[in-house]
Swiss-Prot record:
Residues 363-373, 396-413, 468-483 have a biased composition (Low complexity). The record marks 215 as: Arginine finger. It comes from the Eukaryota. The gene is ECM25. This is Protein ECM25. Residues 543-562 have a biased composition (Basic and acidic residues). Gene3D superfamilies: CRAL-TRIO lipid binding domain (3.40.525.10), Rho GTPase activation protein (1.10.555.10). SMART domains: RhoGAP. Keywords: Cell wall biogenesis/degradation, Cytoplasm. Residues 362-447, 468-495, 543-563 are annotated as: Disordered.
């Protein structure tokens, strides 16, 4: 069955037309069904008619601009007749609301339909004097770079199909410099934190079923496109990317680009001893150096789950450690670094093998560290102002004044994490402390999590990790500590609540059609059409599929236009080819006559 989601074809974006202020809608032709996928012309006609009826119902009843990604028409070899039919389906009233059309990746198909409609209806879209009140103005755009100069593309939901087509024209999307200043440093950090969390969540669900994850590289084009999207802080739908590309971005961009390497090779003493004591002592030195303990506590168990599912992932501790070493040790793959990579790979293998015991040793004695002797461990602030210093320790200050025994009981589980290791507050204890009335009495500085703690992306899990990007490591924090890089964006003393606008820009699930009942009916109707018991149609479908396979193997030309002339056609097929062209022309004329009467 062919899955057609109307919400992917026509939808409202978060961007607006900068000139008129009208909302911008998007028509993505790459999601239109191809006639070759259906196999039968009659069924395809019915499908296009039903699809256009659904799209007409979604048209807004207010002025708007429309962005058309037209590459799907040529890629899916949709006949120009269907372009005329789609235009004829539009009600006459829509011309009052549709103000401007941006046609991106214009193809021969779009030019043909535009010329045919213009000649048949005897009007010109670009004539601002005669038809500016009757028909929208057209703006022909070559690629996404040109589109970025007209509207804000960071708020558009651009599909991966469109990005891949645009990549053939230009490998990188060059946007105006002002794009990088539209978000504040806090919003940029929130955006990239959200991308990191969403990718990690997807990896936890899907990586256990993928063979040689983190070893097989992702698609080069897709990875480059993804990195460009992050650089622009663009809207992104993660459901369109394959798991290997996401794993490459997560490991080689977020993890590898942290301010300090997760496994510094310089801190691994030689010779390496493959036992628990040596591995544990070295690990304590490492986390004391980079303060990434909380990150380790989340990603290492995830790596061990990949090893546990070795039947599907084809990984053991040796192969996985070898794949992770360049990113975790922040080393390049070259002949000059082979010795260093061998050291890092051997230690990472031991760390994966002994980590359950190491995690128990590290997390077992938090109660003994909760004494007041841990307070001097914190570095002194740049200024001696107590308000600046209390931003990291603001949750512990009210406890010293409170005589309540109930509050003093809960403080040991919270204080050592906030004071000794700097970042991570457990989600459950964080939610209790925020709701406690003692923290609302005199907060030194307002904390966003107090007002909206429910906006934390992963409030009940430890996947709310530090942002692994070099750009975020330079963000200014109230108190400069060695572990400021490892502070999570939520559930921490400097809690950065992710705003609703930033949340809307990163999606990990495909868009769903709001009219679910109508969608089910539409799918049922289409299924009933495909299940018609007609021997003639089945035979015709089989012949079309055989012709399609034959054409794919014989014709490898990259030209969009056929290299065969009329004399090249076999005598037995000349009549049928001419008949098909003549029938197509008659259908186009019939549709245009009907359109004239309606418009």
């Amino acid at each position: 069955m062919i899955d057609i989601n109307v919400n992917n074809i026509f939808f409202r974006s978060y961007s607006v037309d900068p000139n008129s202020g009208h909302a911008i809608y998007v028509f993505d032709s790459t999601y239109l069904p191809a006639s070759d996928e259906i196999g039968d012309k009659q069924v395809y006609d019915l499908l296009i008619n039903a699809l256009m009826d659904r799209l007409v119902m979604k048209l807004p009843q207010a002025p708007y601009s429309l962005v058309i990604f037209s590459s799907g028409f040529s890629q899916r070899k949709i006949s120009w007749v269907y372009g005329i039919k789609m235009f004829a389906k539009l009600p006459k009233e829509t011309k009052f609301y549709l103000q401007k059309i941006f046609i991106v990746h214009e193809s021969f198909f779009v030019r043909s339909v535009y010329q045919v409609i213009s000649n048949a209806m005897n009007f010109n879209f670009l004539d601002s004097k005669d038809s500016q009140h009757d028909f929208p103005s057209l703006v022909h755009v070559l690629d996404l770079t040109s589109l970025s100069e007209l509207i804000d593309i960071t708020r558009l939901r651009i599909s991966l199909n469109v990005y891949l087509y645009d990549y053939q024209i230009r490998e990188h999307i060059n946007v105006p410099e002002e794009y990088y200043n539209r978000l504040t440093p806090l919003a940029i950090r929130q955006y990239r934190q959200l991308v990191f969390d969403k990718i990690f969540k997807k990896l936890q669900n899907d990586a256990l079923l993928c063979e040689l994850i983190f070893q097989k590289p992702g698609n080069y084009k897709k990875v480059n496109i993804f990195l460009d999207i992050i650089k622009r802080n663009n809207y992104i739908d993660l459901s369109q990317w394959d798991i290997y590309s996401l794993a490459s971005v997560w490991l080689n961009y977020f993890i590898k680009n942290k301010a300090k390497p997760l496994i510094p090779i310089e801190l691994i003493p030689l010779p390496i001893v493959d036992d628990l004591k040596f591995t544990s002592e070295t690990f304590r030195k490492i986390i004391k150096f980079n303060q990434y303990q909380d990150l380790f506590m989340v990603i290492i168990p995830f790596f061990n789950r990949i090893i546990a599912h070795g039947e599907s992932t084809k990984h053991d501790s040796r192969t996985l450690s070898k794949a992770l070493t360049p990113a975790l040790c922040k080393e390049k793959l070259s002949m000059m670094t082979n010795d260093r990579l061998a050291i890092g790979s051997r230690y990472i293998k031991n760390l994966l093998d002994f980590f359950p015991e190491i995690a128990k040793e590290i997390s077992s004695p938090p109660s003994s560290v909760s004494s007041s002797s841990t307070i001097p461990v914190l570095p002194k602030p740049r200024k001696s102002s107590p308000t600046r210093y209390s931003e990291l320790g603001c949750l512990t200050l009210p406890r010293s004044r409170s005589p309540s025994p109930q509050r003093s009981v809960t403080s040991p589980t919270y204080t050592p994490v906030a004071l000794q290791n700097t970042p991570v507050l457990k989600p459950k204890s964080s939610s209790r402390n925020v709701s406690s009335p003692s923290f609302n009495a005199k907060p030194p500085l307002p904390i966003k999590a107090v007002t909206r703690p429910q906006l934390s992306l992963t409030s009940n899990s430890n996947t709310d990790l530090a942002l692994a990007s070099s750009s975020t490591d330079t963000l200014s924090s109230p108190t400069k500590t060695p572990s400021a890089d490892s502070l999570p964006l939520s559930n921490s003393s400097t809690d950065l609540t992710i705003s609703d606008n930033i949340k809307e820009m990163v999606k990990d699930e495909p868009a769903k059609d709001k009219n679910s009942v109508e969608t089910d009916i539409f799918v049922q109707q289409f299924e009933s059409l495909t299940l018609v018991q007609n021997a003639k149609i089945k035979k015709f479908d089989k012949e079309l599929q055989e012709k399609k396979k034959k054409n794919e193997t014989t014709s490898k030309t990259a030209d969009k236009f056929s290299q065969k002339g009329y004399s090249d056609i076999k005598a037995s097929n000349k009549v049928s080819r001419l008949a098909a062209l003549y029938e197509e022309r008659l259908q186009g004329l019939q549709v245009m006559n009907e359109m004239k009467q309606r418009w």
